[in-house]
Structures are given as structure tokens and as C-alpha cells.
Design a protein with these regions (language model features):
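Residue-level signal for the nucleotide or nucleotide-sugar donor/cofactor binding architecture
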Residues: 64, 95, 102-105, 150, ...
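C-terminal "lid/loop" region of Rossmann-like NAD(P)-dependent oxidoreductases
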Residues: 211, 239-242, 250-257, 264-282, ...
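Hydrophobic alpha-helix immediately C-terminal to the catalytic Tyr-X-X-X-Lys motif of short-chain
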Residues: 158, 162, 166, 196, ...
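N-terminal Rossmann-like NAD(P)+-binding domain of SDR-like oxidoreductases, especially those catalyzing
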Residues: 1-182
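Glycine/proline-rich active-site loop of Rossmann-fold NAD(P)-dependent oxidoreductases
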Residues: 157, 182-195, 202-204, 209, ...
Length: 298
């Protein structure tokens, strides 16, 4: 193996949407050796980075299985870890709560192995879901209470607590990214933005749960990756947390109407019964920290 790499970086979940885009950003730097681990449950090898530098390795493995992931840590001396592996998607996580809770094993495995192998910092993909049904607008990283109820949100919340605990007890540095809705070309078809776009471009009905008054904000993947890479390369957000999203709030109904308009679609909007749980009424992050990462004022 080339010993000239300045940083050896593990990206778990690196065959997923956000993880693969992050891995591509890291692999664009020839000084980085990027090791991607994914169990391909929802990820795809088609999303893996393309690079001329021969600095990417893909290993199919499950971070929730200690034997799987420990052998990878022993084979590489990682400098940094981006732990992005997780079961995602509202309907998928609601339907598989035990599988979601198993992701706690992966968090423990990553932190234990990182602590014992000299990893300098662990970067963790948390979620806006930790805020639950928010009690403050916009949601601020340090003042808005976390209100997690569903297994996915609880796992992300507990994951954050693990990171803080490993720093407090063992000095393992961390950075937490709380991702709000993110969209882009590699996104799976079962997320709201890509689902609406696919329906509109095929003149199929666009289905909305409830009356569509629930709000979300949508962050383009490039902004997400730029913010995270700036934190990494500039050594920012050490032992801290940042919302990664957009602060333009939009109802799901308005999103559907806008997509129909810009695609010149003949799609009709069809309303389905509201989800019993998991569909929060509002989401809007305070992105002051993210704007600082991107060196933007607006």
C-alpha cells in the first residue's frame, strides 16, 4: 500500500447518498486514502467515488458486527473516521425498529475501535430527528431541547451521547453533524424530493401524507459536503455540533406544487391519510454555524 498518504480515512455508509458524496469529496484529494465500508443494505456500489488517484478502497462489511469492522481497523491505521452508516428513511425505520436499534452496536464498535487505534477524530452523521417535534424555531444546536421519541431519533441522540462520553472519559475528539433534509442526484427514489421529481417527470400522481401543511427545509448535497469538508480541513467544530441544512422553510404541499410547475408536469396531487407517527409538523434549523463553515453571510 502507498505509504505516502497523509490521511487514512474510514467512511462508513460510504455507498449511500450522503456518505458516497462525502467520500468523493475526500477522494478528490490525492493525499487521502479513503476506505469505504458499507453493507449495501440500502447503499449501492454504483455510488462509489470515481478518482484517478487510486486512493479509494471499498469493503463490504457491517459496522454493527464487531468482527467485521475490527478486522478493518486492524488492517488500516485510520487517522479519521466518518461514521455515516445507518438505516434511513421514515417508513423504513418505522417498519424496522429493532434493526434501527441495532445501529447502536455500530456506534459502540466504531468508538471503541477508534479509541484503541489512535484515531484523531470521529465525525458523526446525526439528524434533525433528534429534535423530535421541536419546541423552538429555528432549532438551535445548543438551546433547543432534544425531543427524541422514535427509535431512529433515539439512536441518533444516544449516538451523540456516546461521542461526548468517549471524549470526556478517553479524550477521543468528535464532531457531530445534524443533517436536515438533503437532496441531490444520488438520492434514493423513496425520499420526498426525488420521489416527487420522479412522479412529476412521469406525469404520475404525487402523493402527500396528511394535508401537506408540514414544513421542511431542503439542502442541496454540495452545500452539505462543502460544510463538512470545511470543518474537516480547517479543524473546526472540534467536540462540537452543527446543524447542516437550509433555513428556507417550505410546506410539503408547496414543494409538490413547485415541482409540478418547474417540470411542466400534468401530475395531480393526491392526499393520503397522515402517518400515525414520524411526520413532524415543522422543521427549520438555525444554520448560523453552517454559514460560518461555508463563509457565507446569507
Amino acid at each position: 500500500m502507498n505509504s505516502s498518504f497523509q490521511s487514512r480515512i474510514l467512511v462508513t455508509g460510504g455507498a449511500g447518498f450522503v456518505g458516497s458524496c462525502l467520500a468523493q469529496g475526500l477522494a478528490n484529494n490525492p493525499d487521502n486514502l479513503v476506505i469505504i465500508v458499507d453493507n449495501l443494505l440500502t447503499g449501492s456500489e454504483n455510488k462509489l467515488p470515481i478518482t484517478p488517484y487510486n486512493n479509494v478502497r471499498f469493503i463490504k462489511a457491517d459496522v454493527n458486527d464487531f468482527n467485521d469492522i475490527s478486522s478493518i481497523f486492524h488492517a488500516f491505521s485510520f487517522d479519521y473516521v466518518f461514521h455515516y452508516a445507518a438505516l434511513v428513511g421514515v417508513k423504513r425505520t418505522l417498519a424496522n425498529p429493532v434493526m434501527v436499534l441495532n445501529d447502536l452496536n455500530g456506534i459502540r464498535n466504531i468508538l471503541s475501535l477508534s479509541k484503541n487505534s489512535g484515531v484523531k477524530r470521529v465525525y458523526y452523521s446525526s439528524s434533525s430527528e433528534v429534535y423530535g417535534e421541536p419546541v423552538e424555531f429555528p432549532q438551535n444546536e445548543h438551546t433547543t431541547p432534544l425531543n427524541s421519541r422514535l427509535p431512529y431519533a433515539i439512536v441518533k441522540n444516544v449516538g451523540e451521547a456516546y461521542l461526548r462520553s468517549y471524549y470526556q472519559e478517553y479524550g477521543l475528539n468528535f464532531t457531530i453533524f445534524r443533517f436536515f433534509n438533503t437532496y441531490g442526484p444520488k438520492q434514493s427514489a423513496d425520499f420526498v424530493m426525488s420521489k416527487f421529481l420522479n412522479s412529476a417527470m412521469n406525469n404520475q400522481d404525487i402523493t402527500i401524507y396528511g394535508d401537506g401543511s408540514q414544513t421542511r427545509t431542503f439542502c442541496y448535497i454540495d452545500d452539505n459536503i462543502d460544510a463538512c469538508l470545511n470543518a474537516f480541513y480547517n479543524d473546526l467544530l472540534v467536540n462540537d455540533v452543527a446543524n447542516i441544512g437550509n433555513d428556507y422553510e417550505l410546506t410539503i404541499l408547496d414543494l409538490a406544487r413547485k415541482i409540478i410547475e418547474v417540470t411542466n408536469s400534468e401530475s395531480k396531487i393526491v392526499f393520503l391519510p397522515a402517518l400515525k407517527e414520524g411526520d413532524m409538523t415543522r422543521r427549520c434549523p438555525d444554520i448560523t454555524v453552517m454559514k460560518q463553515l461555508l463563509q457565507r453571510k446569507t
